[in-house]
Structures are given as C-alpha cells and as structure tokens.
C-alpha cells in the first residue's frame, strides 16, 4: 500500500457546503473536528489547491496512506495528493488564510 515516508503539509480548498458536511460528520466523534468519508484530494503546493473561500492546511504524519497523483493524471499543476478515505482531522488553529488541521487517522 502507498504510505508517505515523511511528514507532509498539504492544502485543500473546500466550499462552505463541504466544510459544513465535514463538521456534521464529526459531530458525534469525540476525537476529531472534521471527518471526510471519501478520499481527501489535496495539493502538495501552497496556492495550487482549489480556490474556495475555505482553505485547509493539513499536517500529515509519515506513515499515512496517501498517493501522489500529479504524475498519473493530466493535471500536474495541482500537485495532487489523495489521502485514504475516512480522514479524521483535528483543527489546531486558524489564521487569515488557512484553517490549520492535523490528520489523525484514515481507514
């Protein structure tokens, strides 16, 4: 299986609807603030994430199941990294640009 052998910082832009869904999904979980049931499509490069109002900066520990898609699709410019489904995220802080999150677990 594909895992990262180093810590990563990944970026994800989401619309308000998706962000609210992620919060709703995590509502009954005591250990996380955001929960994504599907795969989490992110960018390895800051400002290459999808340009939505809500932007997540996700700290991903080494050993996380994820795959770099930038060399297998025709969208190299996104530097896409897909994180395994069932991602649990903890919000650490917020700044004027990003909601800073730590990835806790995946499936």
Where are the regions a protein language model picked out?
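Mono-ADP-ribosyltransferase
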Residues: 1-107
């Amino acid at each position: 299986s594909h895992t990262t052998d180093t810590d990563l910082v990944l970026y994800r832009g989401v619309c308000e609807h998706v962000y609210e869904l992620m919060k709703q999904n995590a509502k009954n979980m005591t250990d996380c603030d955001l929960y994504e049931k599907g795969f989490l499509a992110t960018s390895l490069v800051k400002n290459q994430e999808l340009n939505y109002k809500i932007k997540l900066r996700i700290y991903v520990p080494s050993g996380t199941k994820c795959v770099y898609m930038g060399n297998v699709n025709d969208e190299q410019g996104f530097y896409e990294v897909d994180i395994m489904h069932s991602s649990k995220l903890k919000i650490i802080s917020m700044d004027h640009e990003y909601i800073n999150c730590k990835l806790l677990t995946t499936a």
